């Protein structure tokens, strides 16, 4: 099973990276590097998915991503 992750530097705290899963908003984390943030977020994702399974709730489908181009002003 795979989920799309967003990993980006926190604009309010330079040097802090955030990782989150749009399909599972409860699963997110941060770290000093993109890799560290993603590793922590993956742990959170596994915990959330285990909880959903244990409580008989359906697992959310992943999101669909698209890139949108615009003319820079």
Give, region by region, the residue ranges found by the protein language model.
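Short glycine/serine/threonine-biased micro-segments
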Residues: 13, 29, 54
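Short, charged, surface-exposed hinge/linker loops at domain edges
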Residues: 1-6, 39-73
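Gly/Ser/Thr-rich helix-start
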Residues: 16, 32, 57
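A short, exposed loop/beta-hairpin motif centered on an aromatic-Gly-Thr core
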Residues: 25-36
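Short aromatic-glycine-(Arg/Gly/Cys) micro-motifs in beta-strand/loop hairpins
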Residues: 9-24
């Amino acid at each position: 099973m795979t989920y799309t992750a967003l990993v980006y530097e926190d604009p309010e705290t330079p040097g802090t990276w955030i990782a989150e899963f749009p399909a599972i908003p409860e699963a997110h984390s941060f770290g000093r590097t993109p890799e560290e943030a993603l590793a922590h977020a993956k742990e959170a994702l596994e915990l959330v998915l285990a909880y959903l399974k244990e409580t008989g709730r359906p697992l959310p489908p992943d999101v669909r991503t698209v890139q949108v181009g615009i003319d820079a002003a």
